[in-house]
Regions:
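Active-site recognition of the HExxH zinc-binding catalytic motif
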Residues: 74, 199, 304-321
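Short pre-active-site segment immediately N-terminal to the catalytic Zn-binding motif
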Residues: 188-191, 286-310
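Active-site-proximal segments of metallohydrolase catalytic domains
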Residues: 214-290
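Beta-strand-enriched, solvent-exposed domains that form extended recognition/catalytic surfaces
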Residues: 24-149
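Fold-level signature of zinc-dependent metallopeptidase catalytic domains
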Residues: 150-206, 219-229
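Sec-dependent N-terminal signal peptides
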Residues: 3-13
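Boundary at the C-terminal end of the N-terminal hydrophobic targeting segment
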Residues: 15-17
Length: 422
């Protein structure tokens, strides 16, 4: 079996390398919206709609995902040849909800949406989920014709966009779109200033500062009727564009939105690979999900830290490196290697940062002063104190006392920046 798998990999690589954008795609974007429904032990994906959006701003070279991060992967196949012509890994708010206590007794639906280049000919799209043993299982498939007259072309959510940081052609850069939540029309000037401030914070952190010329950052002027955001635990409800709220999954600081279709609508006004929601509040909070969106409150003393930390999740698929957080139950099975690049259960550590550890560093690595600035294997991470390990004693993915990514996280982020900017 091992020989068969290896042969398949080598046979597949030349095929992937031969995928040329213009052979299969037009220079515009197709959005597939769906509903994700289920509970702790079951899930289904049901189709909602297709929307034609603007020019394709993703890489036209790197069409096939090479990282396999995320709890799901979307694959697009040319129907005539059965060749894989596009794929992306991602995670969802639904999947996080599945790990909560509520999911044991309640069935819920969440909005989901994926983008891919607009195909020239018929394609079939599938979405696979990753089970607890790291195996993929197909849970959705749909054949799509570019001639389908039900593909929506109307533009109902048009807002002005602006450049925050510009380096060049969006198809050759990592494009980040900053979208406002809880900023009224009169507060758009503040939104511009917040975009500038937080973008500067990001571009002054490694590895982003070394890759400044590989990154575009955009803003969208999309005002809300009221300023601020919902705080259900305090009885505060605001009429805002994206319906963000604190107390997501009954965790006060977890600031997210389940209105993902609206998030996509607003983001579509600018080129983007990554979505970042800036929430106009001084209350501490934020959140992010890999290739879904990132979100932060902008006006508290920790906003700069949160902005960078959350983008580590959203862009790089980085895990939280702290333990002792009971928000999620059994997020990382100890008999399976996590897909996140910066934590390990030691089940398959050879695929992680083993080569970055200096000779003589003990494994596991004790939390002693002499190892403070060393890469090792420190127990505690992924919300638990035992059985999950992190690369360093501290980093921005661990606590407020560090403002920098560790070298393992920098390496993971740099590879993704390069992927988008080729």
């Amino acid at each position: 079996m091992k020989k068969i798998i290896i042969a398949f990999v080598f046979l597949s690589l030349p095929i992937f390398g031969q995928i040329k954008f213009n052979d299969y795609f037009l220079n515009k974007t197709l959005r597939l919206d769906y509903y994700h429904t289920g509970n702790k032990t079951s899930e289904t994906i049901s189709f909602d709609k297709l929307i034609e959006e603007g020019p394709w701003s993703g890489s036209k070279k790197n069409l096939i995902d090479t990282f396999y991060y995320g709890n799901y992967i979307m694959k697009v196949f040319d129907q005539a040849s059965n060749i894989l012509i596009y794929s992306r890994g991602f995670s969802t708010l639904y999947q996080e909800w599945q790990t909560t206590e509520e999911a044991k007794t309640v069935t819920r639906s969440f909005e989901g949406s994926m983008l891919f280049p607009f195909p020239k000919s018929k394609v079939f799209v599938e979405i696979d989920n990753r089970d607890r043993e790291n195996n993929y299982k197909k849970i959705f498939e749909k054949t799509i014709s570019p001639e389908d007259y039900f593909i929506i072309k109307e533009k109902n959510n048009s807002y002005p966009d602006f450049k925050v940081h510009y380096s060049g052609d969006p198809s050759e850069k990592l494009d980040i779109v900053l979208i406002p939540e809880g900023y009224t029309k009169e507060e758009m000037g503040k939104f511009h200033k917040d975009c500038d401030r937080l973008s500067n914070v990001l571009l002054n952190r490694s590895p982003f500062k070394e890759s400044e010329n590989k990154i575009n950052i955009w803003g969208v002027e999309a005002p809300s009727n009221e300023s601020g955001t919902d705080i259900p635990g305090k009885g505060i409800w605001k009429n805002t564009l994206l319906n963000t709220r604190f107390y997501t999954f009954d965790t006060e600081r977890y600031l997210m939105t389940s209105d993902y279709f609206k998030v996509r609508d607003v983001a579509a006004n600018a080129p983007y690979d990554q979505i970042y929601i800036l929430v106009n509040t001084n209350k501490y909070g934020g959140g992010a999900i890999y290739n879904f969106y990132s979100e932060t409150a902008v006006d508290n003393n920790s906003s700069d830290y949160i902005f960078v930390h959350e983008f580590g999740h959203g862009l790089g698929g980085l895990a939280d490196e702290y333990g002792n957080d009971k928000t999620y139950e059994d997020m990382y099975p100890l008999d399976t290697e996590p897909w996140e690049p910066n934590i390990t259960t030691l089940v398959n550590f050879d695929k992680k940062w083993k080569k970055m550890i200096e000779p003589g560093i003990p494994i596991p690595t004790p939390e002693e002063v002499k190892y403070k600035n060393k890469i090792g294997i420190f127990e505690g991470g992924g919300y638990v104190s035992k059985g999950v390990y992190r690369p360093t004693m501290n980093s921005i993915m661990n606590s407020f006392t560090s403002t920098e990514f560790n070298e393992v996280c920098k390496d993971a982020l740099q590879r993704i920046i390069n992927f988008y900017s080729e």
